[in-house]
């Protein structure tokens, strides 16, 4: 799966490296393109973490709520 922990580390590293390059070397159109790339990387990172981009709250990671055992043995 794309959102495995090792891939999240790679996404963070790419985002940081891209941020440094924007500040030091690129200008004009290239800088704008790289900022878009950084934005996309950060969106992917938020998606993989399960964060909601609208309100910043974490989404529930459980598929179904826990079921209580209502049947008791006699």
From Swiss-Prot:
Location of this chain's protein in the cell: Host cytoplasm; Host nucleus membrane; Host rough endoplasmic reticulum membrane; Host cell membrane
BP GO terms, sorted: monoatomic ion transmembrane transport
Modified-residue entries (Phosphoserine), positions: 15, 19
Domain of life of the organism encoding this protein: Viruses
Keywords: Host cell membrane, Host cytoplasm, Host endoplasmic reticulum, Host membrane, Host nucleus, Host-virus interaction, Ion channel, Ion transport, Membrane, Phosphoprotein, Signal-anchor, Transmembrane, Transmembrane helix, Transport, Viral ion channel
Phosphothreonine, modified sites: 29
Transmembrane segments: 36-52
Keyword Transport: yes
Post-translation changes: Phosphorylated by host kinase. Phosphorylation segregates agnoprotein in cytoplasm, whereas unphosphorylated agnoprotein migrate to the nucleus.
Pfam families recorded: Polyoma_agno (PF01736)
Membrane topology: Single-pass type II membrane protein
Cytoplasmic topology ranges: 1-35
InterPro entries: Polyoma_agno
GO cellular component, one term: host cell plasma membrane
Residue ranges, Extracellular side: 53-74
A GO molecular-function annotation: channel activity
Primary localization class, coarse: host cell
Summary of subunit composition and partner proteins: Homooligomer. Interacts with VP1. Interacts with large T antigen; this interaction may impact upon the activity of T-antigen on the control of viral gene transcription and replication. Interacts with small t antigen. Interacts with host CBX5; this interaction induces the dissociation of CBX5 from LBR, resulting in destabilization of the nuclear envelope.
Function: Alters the structure of the nuclear envelope by interacting with host CBX5 and disrupting CBX5 association with LBR. Involved in the perinuclear-nuclear localization of the capsid protein VP1 during virion assembly and maturation. Plays an important role in the release of progeny virions from infected cells and in viral propagation, probably by acting as a viral ionic channel in the host plasma membrane. Allows influx of extracellular calcium ions in the host cell. May contribute to viral genome transcription and translation of viral late proteins.
Family membership: Belongs to the polyomavirus agnoprotein family.
Protein known as: Agnoprotein
Upper taxonomic lineage: Viruses, Monodnaviria, Shotokuvirae, Cossaviricota, Papovaviricetes
């Amino acid at each position: 799966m794309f959102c495995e922990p090792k891939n999240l580390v790679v996404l963070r590293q790419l985002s940081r490296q891209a941020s440094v390059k924007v500040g030091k070397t690129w200008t004009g159109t290239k800088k704008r393109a790289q900022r878009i790339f950084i934005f996309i990387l950060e969106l992917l990172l938020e998606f993989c973490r399960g964060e909601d981009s609208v309100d910043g709250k974490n989404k529930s990671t459980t598929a179904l709520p826990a079921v209580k055992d209502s049947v008791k043995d006699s």
